[in-house]
Amino acid sequence: MNRRQFHAGAAGAILLEMLPGCAGTVTQSKGAHLATVDTHAHIFRRGLKLANVRRYAPDYDATLNDYLGMLDRHGIARGVLVQPSFLGTDNSFMLAGLRQAPGRLRGIAVVDPDTPFAELKKMNEAGVAGIRLNLVGGAPVPDFWSAPWHTLLTRAADLGWQVEVHREARDLPRILPPLLNAGVNLVVDHFGRPDPALGVNDPGFRFLLETGASRRVWVKLSAAYRNGADGAGEKTALAAIPLLRNAFGMERLMWGSDWPHTQFEKSIDYGRARKMLDIWLPNPDERKVVLVDTPTSLFRFA
């Protein structure tokens, strides 16, 4: 299947070899796959209407059937479809996917602040469990203290939704406070996106750790490769894990594959992304919390 198979190249193999304990020594606990949840994946196909403002657009398809097959091959019971940035606020393809596998999937939508409550309720009925603020790559940060945003955030809280934040760590100190003030639960993507040069010493990442005391912030252990090239992101992940554990507890951490690893298809694949969690968390009891208990509750699979 050429690119659609998303095979990892030699560079990805080198990254794993750089990390301790990678030589096939870590195995998944028996039975854990029965209820495991992948909390971060995207589906799309060529020909869909693209957002007017976008950083990129893939030149291949990543369909629902592709994703469900990937889950099956890796023993993952459930998945969460996150609206891709390049599709903007047109969530129709993602919603169609949710309706085809209602018991197995949940969704995270991207919406405008003036989206009618009735439309949000329809999304909720389809399996949407939250909204995403994809602000990475220099996108302007909205005024989340403003009335339109406060209304949206309040409605999200009323629905029991989470708000997922994707932004470089340096800006988290000005983004997270108004969101927490609105009363919603927050999920921060990809280890909080610390600066590759600073790693866990990034002041924004340190601020993220402080929000653990709120008990309303979760962090995705996902896409470490987006936080630094040539293995730097993976090394930052290893350094971040004990800090995140201490600040949030295992019950506020989740794993996501980030499939189909857009813009990194040649250096990572699904199996490698899943194995990274075994490296980060060699304790099977901790992995069960991250893979099963926490996402099952937060995404309302139970």
Segments from the language model and where they lie:
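Alpha-helical scaffold segments that flank or form the walls of functional sites
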Residues: R54-V82, L87-Q100
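Conserved, mostly hydrophobic/aromatic
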Residues: H40, L71, M94, A156, ...
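Hydrophobic faces of well-ordered beta-strands that scaffold small-molecule active sites
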Residues: V37-A41, V80-L81, G107-A109, I131-L133, ...
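Active-site gating/metal-coordination segments in enzymes
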Residues: G88-R170, P177, K220-A224, G231
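Catalytic pocket-lining loop regions of alpha/beta-barrel enzymes
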Residues: W145-M254
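Mid-to-C-terminal alpha-helical segments outside catalytic/metal-binding sites
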Residues: Q5-M18, A23-A35, Y60-R78, L243, ...
